[in-house]
Every structure is written in structure tokens, then in C-alpha cells.
Curated annotation (Swiss-Prot):
Name by which UniProt lists this protein: Cytochrome P450 71B22
Coiled coil: none
GO MF assignments: heme binding; iron ion binding; monooxygenase activity; oxidoreductase activity, acting on paired donors, with incorporation or reduction of molecular oxygen
Family: Belongs to the cytochrome P450 family.
Gene3D superfamilies: Cytochrome P450
EC number annotated for this UniProt entry: 1.14.-.-
The entry's keywords: Heme, Iron, Membrane, Metal-binding, Monooxygenase, Oxidoreductase, Transmembrane, Transmembrane helix
TM region(s), chain numbering: 1-21
Annotated gene: CYP71B22
Swiss-Prot/TrEMBL cofactor(s): heme
Any one GO cellular component localisation term in the record: membrane
Organism: Arabidopsis thaliana
Length: 500
């Protein structure tokens, strides 16, 4: 039976359901008129953040939509975001239950997608203590510095012959190696079961499916279940999850080998010890699903986001030679000539690099839509009534391009942050690459250190040029991705060893 026939047969039921579901009182935010059953889904393209941005130009900073029968509010300005993330942080800090997030979080036993409550708080505390604390950040400094040397050595081989470099692959390998050594105790350069190209494919496939649309989440009465299976979405989602879970099991099994040693204590070892001792975190027993849930968060969020940010930064620098020249001159003047190695002590000296990264976050947030929230009670945002159980999407892409916040918002101009109090740490709602409030990214400090150190190395040791015959206007800026948004076309540049 065709999908269209299912729609026709179930249409009367859905009309009744949709009418009952729609809030009937109070001043709701404005929004485009939806259709029965599908709501506003027909008005959304592949790029969800751009679709939201375009609609918000007509319907305002707080916009009401329906994904099928699920009410959704899209927030597109600093002021509205502050109301959600600060004023109503507690009432909006749980997550909607979605098919993909349930699967990849091992039934919400992670940190990023877990429902708000005591279990989530205890898991977050564990991750902060064992992975993201300031003590751990300092202790793992040697890993980040070692991997930055590996990156420089790889690029040097290409620079000697002026061979074009795919910076996507180079920077992904850098971030993946660091994150997996920090979190998993695994040095991928020495693992016999890890192929970096396959790891990259695994991350991209998992993130694509994590951000995929499941009709089951938004259509009632079993229709979504049927469509997901007819379309193949259900099968594709579960195959991707199985491949990721199999990789995690390899890492866990490697930890369990007799006599296996890591170069430091990692969260996998800590949680395995808790599982073996039947220890509790708060009120619950730690299980392998909790372990894999944390691994999923760290692996998918930590590996790709840093690489994406560095790629966009290098892309904008290639498009703006003035900024590139100014940045490299500052770096080399401050750090001096012929420095053999960059250390994290150098990061505090290079102020303009931080401005470039902030401007990159503004124009190219790795996750343009923060992880969705869900209201746990009725509340008001910008004077509009927001019913309980409404999904909230915060569009940092729109906020970063709001002319009320930013002069000439579409221009790449790091100087806009000179003497500006605005930072990315969750206290300024016009710049939210890591979110804010209770659900702010716990790995923020680690993530930004990885990005700063990687960029500092590639900009200090090498001069960069476009391939022969390519002009600045030829650089493709098209985006790709759902959960995180990367540069679709690889950034290929030619490195040259800097002549002192």
C-alpha cells in the first residue's frame, strides 16, 4: 500500500487529533499556517537552520511551528534566547524524546540527550570530574601538545614539496587523536583496529543519522512507524548505530585485555571499574549503556566540532588575506622566530587569534541549532505563551547574523570583538557556540584549547596559498550536515614552510 493511501485513510483521525493537540487559548507566537498531519514540515528544506532563518524574517524572533503534530518554538534573537536559557533555564532544560537521540544515547543514559533529573546531574558530575575538570585539562596538556607536533610533522612533508593538503582530513585526524587519547586512553596511531579514514566516515555517518528526521517522532497512530520502514530510514538509522556501537565495543574490549595499560587514567577505565564493583552514581547502578552513552557524547560532539571550527576559520582566512597576514604577523612577532615547538603557554599571548575564533563561531557555529529543549511547564517568552511539552529550537545561526547585535553581520571582521565584552562561554547570548545554562557543553574548555592550539601551529609554521589558478571568489562556502554543519567542499590549500 502506498504512503499516500495511508495518508488518505487516516486523514480524518489525524484532523481530530491535530485539532485537540493544538493549544486553544493564550497568545501563541506567530508562525506560518501549517497543513493537516504534516504541520509545517513542507516548508522546511534540508538545511534546517537556514529554513528557520528565512521563516523568522517574516514571522519574528519567536516563531511557532508544528513538526507533524508536535509543537515547536524557534528562537532567533539574543533577547529571546536569554529568556529561554537564563530566565526559564530550569523549565526548559530537559530534552525531547526522539528516535535517533534515544538510540545514540543508549536510551538517554548519556549527558547530552538525557532527560533532566538526578541521574543526569550525577552523570554530568562524573564526566566533569574524570574528563573535563580544570585539573584534567592541565594534566592532559602533554597529549594536546604531542598531537599538535604530529600535525605539524604531517603538514611539513607536504610543505616541502608544495603539495596540496586537504585540511579537513588533517585537522580531523588531529582532533580525533586528541579526543580519543583524552577520553578513551587510545593512541590511534598505535591501534591495530583503527583506520582514521574509517573513523571519519563513522563520525559523519553517525552525526548524519543523529540529526535525521524520523516520522515516528512527529506522526501519531503508527503512520510514522510505517513510513520510516517503507522509506528505509529505520534500517539506515539502526545500521549506523550498530557500526558505532561495534567501534565502542572494540575500544572497551581493548581496555579489558589482560596487561593492557593506558598512558593515563581515562573515563572508560573509571566507569569499567565502577561496573565491576557494582558501584552507584547517585541512586543508579552504572551499566555498560551508561559507559557507551558517555563515549557517544564525547566521540560525536568532541571530534568533529573542533575540526569544523578550524576548517571554517582557515576558510575565512583564505578568503580574507588581510586578516590572515595580520594574524600571522602578530603570532610570529609575539612568539619569536624559529620556535621549535608551540606550547599551551603560548595561547594566552596571541589575542588576535582569539578574536578570529570568536568571529568564526559567530558566522559558522558548529551546531547552528543548539540541542533542542522541551518545556516542562507553561511559560512566557517575549510575551508569548509557550505550552508545556513544546520543543524549543534556538537558532544561533540567526542570532549571529542579527543586524541588531552586529554591524555588517555578514562580513568576516574579527576586529568587531576588540574591547568587546562578548565571549562564547554562555554569559553573552549573542554568541552561543557551546550553549548556555544548565545544559551548556561540559567540554567547552577542552574544545576551545584544542582549536586554539591547532590553529596556532598551522599558522605559525606555515604560509598558506590557494591552488594554482584558483581565486578567492572560487572558494566554495556551501554547508553540509544536520547535527553539526561542516564545509561541504573540502578546503585544499598549499602549505609552505615559513622562511624566517
Amino acid at each position: 500500500m502506498s504512503i499516500s493511501l495511508y495518508f488518505l485513510l487516516l486523514l480524518p483521525l489525524f484532523l481530530i487529533f491535530f485539532k485537540k493537540l493544538s493549544p486553544s487559548k493564550g497568545k501563541l507566537p506567530p508562525g506560518p499556517l501549517g497543513l493537516p498531519i504534516i504541520g509545517n514540515l513542507h516548508q522546511l528544506g534540508k538545511s534546517l537552520h537556514r529554513s528557520f532563518h528565512k521563516l523568522s524574517q517574516n514571522y519574528g524572533p519567536v516563531m511557532f511551528l508544528h513538526f507533524g503534530v508536535v509543537p515547536v518554538v524557534v528562537v532567533s534573537t539574543r533577547e529571546a534566547a536569554e529568556e529561554v536559557l537564563k530566565t526559564h533555564d530550569l523549565e526548559t532544560c530537559t530534552r525531547p524524546k526522539l528516535t535517533a537521540t534515544k538510540l545514540f544515547s543508549y536510551n538517554y543514559k548519556d549527558i547530552g540527550f538525557a532527560q533532566y533529573g538526578d541521574d543526569w546531574r550525577e552523570m554530568r558530575k562524573l564526566a566533569m570530574l574524570e574528563l573535563f575538570s580544570s585539573k584534567k585539562l592541565k594534566a592532559f596538556r602533554y597529549i594536546r601538545e604531542e598531537e599538535s607536533e604530529v600535525l605539524v610533522n604531517k603538514l611539513s612533508k607536504s610543505a616541502e614539496t608544495r603539495t596540496m593538503v586537504d585540511l579537513r582530513k588533517a585537522l580531523f585526524s588531529y582532533t580525533a587523536s586528541i579526543v580519543c587519547r583524552l577520553a578513551f586512553g587510545q593512541n590511534f596511531h598505535e591501534c591495530d583496529f583503527v583506520d582514521m579514514d574509517k573513523v571519519e566516515d563513522l563520525v559523519l555517518e553517525s552525526e548524519t543519522n543523529l540529526g535525521s528526521f524520523a516520522f515516528t517522532d512527529f506522526f501519531p497512530a503508527g503512520l510514522g512507524w510505517v513510513i520510516d520502514r517503507i522509506s528505509g530510514q529505520h534500517s539506515e538509522l539502526h545500521k549506523a548505530f550498530a557500526r558505532l556501537s561495534n567501534f565502542f565495543q572494540h575500544v572497551i574490549d581493548d581496555h579489558l585485555k589482560p596487561g593492557q595499560s593506558q598512558d593515563h587514567s581515562d573515563i572508560i577505565g573509571v566507569m569499567l571499574d565502577m561496573i565491576n564493583k557494582e558501584s552507584k552514581v547517585g541512586s543508579f547502578q552504572v551499566t555498560y549503556d551508561h559507559l557507551k552513552g558517555v563515549m557517544s557524547d564525547v566521540f560525536l560532539a568532541g571530534v568533529n566540532a573542533g575540526a569544523i571550527t578550524m576548517i571554517w576559520a582557515m576558510t575565512e582566512l583564505a578568503r580574507h588575506p588581510r586578516v590572515m597576514k595580520k594574524l600571522q604577523q602578530e603570532i610570529r612577532e609575539i612568539l619569536g622566530d624559529n620556535k621549535e615547538k608551540i606550547t599551551e603557554q603560548d595561547l594566552e599571548k596571541v589575542h588576535y587569534l582569539k578574536l578570529v575564533i570568536e568571529e568564526t563561531f559567530r558566522l559558522h557555529p558548529p551546531a547552528p541549532l543548539l540541542l533542542p529543549r522541551e518545556t516542562m511547564s507553561d511559560l512566557k517568552i517575549q510575551g508569548y505563551n509557550i505550552p508545556k511539552n513544546t520543543m524549543i529550537e534556538i537558532n544561533t545561526y540567526s542570532i549571529g547574523r542579527d543586524p541588531n547585535c552586529w554591524e555588517n553581520p555578514n562580513d568576516f571582521n574579527p576586529e568587531r570583538f576588540i574591547d568587546s565584552p562578548v565571549e562564547y562561554k554562555g554569559q553573552h547570548y549573542e554568541l552561543l557556540p557551546f550553549g548556555a545554562g544548565r545544559r551548556i557543553c561540559p567540554g567547552m574548555a577542552t574544545g576551545i584549547t584544542i582549536v586554539e592550539l591547532g590553529l596556532l601551529n598551522v599558522l605559525y609554521f606555515f604560509d598558506w596559498s590557494l591552488p594554482d589558478g584558483m581565486k578567492i571568489e572560487d572558494i566554495d562556502m556551501e554547508e553540509a550536515g544536520a547535527f553539526v554543519v561542516a564545509k561541504k567542499v573540502p578546503l585544499e590549500l598549499i602549505p609552505t614552510p615559513h622562511q624566517w
